[in-house]
Amino acid sequence: MSVSMDHRVLALAGVAQALQQVRRIAETGHSEAATVRTAMDSVFRVDAASPEAVYGSAAALAPGLRLLHNYFRNQGQDEVLPRLALAVLQLERRFVRDASTVATVASGIDAAARQAQQLGDSSHPDVLGSLGGLYAQTISHLRPKVMVQGNPHYLGQAGVVAEIRALLLAALRSAVLWRQMGGSLWDFLFAKRAMIEAVDRALR
């Protein structure tokens, strides 16, 4: 059993889970509160002792793990989601190499964490607005740009756009964790079986 691969698939599930909510809110205007809270909590837990601790528990990543399970078995129902995930994983490389942007984002996350503590809710609309604004001011200027498509009616609403951007920030945070755990795009070519086995272990 590869502990590092087990950790990598948890982080990858965090990416998939956050992006699934991006897709959902872009199409319907609504998201799943518990899943969004898990994503936002992960943004604030920058000094967590383990990947499980970043998300609260491995169980909190069950939706993302199921997405990975289906993807690896060619049973995914959303063809856009893998493309979004690839864009975020590529964006992570550009982000971590931009020290100025990393510092600005870290400072903004600290401020949003204090706001979340005062409000008692990491997914409060004001917190989502702060994190969404932070993403717009910093990460959205990096390339490749993550393009989100959906229902124009909802994508024209400021609250929806803020939540989407906050979730993209959460997805990027998980991508950074994935890379820190040794993740690489080469895994999808040369370690696919190990990834599948790790996902299956996590879902047991």
Swiss-Prot record:
Membrane topology: Peripheral membrane protein
Record-level GO cellular component terms: cytoplasm; plasma membrane
Keyword Cell inner membrane: yes
Pfam families: DUF489
Signal peptide (UniProt feature, chain positions): none
Annotated localization: Cytoplasm; Cell inner membrane
InterPro entries cross-referenced by the UniProt entry: HflD, HflD-like_sf
Keywords for the protein's UniProt record, in alphabetical order: Cell inner membrane, Cell membrane, Cytoplasm, Membrane
Family annotation (PANTHER family): HIGH FREQUENCY LYSOGENIZATION PROTEIN HFLD
Family: Belongs to the HflD family.
Protein name per UniProt: High frequency lysogenization protein HflD homolog
Organism: Xanthomonas axonopodis pv. citri (strain 306)
Gene for this chain: hflD
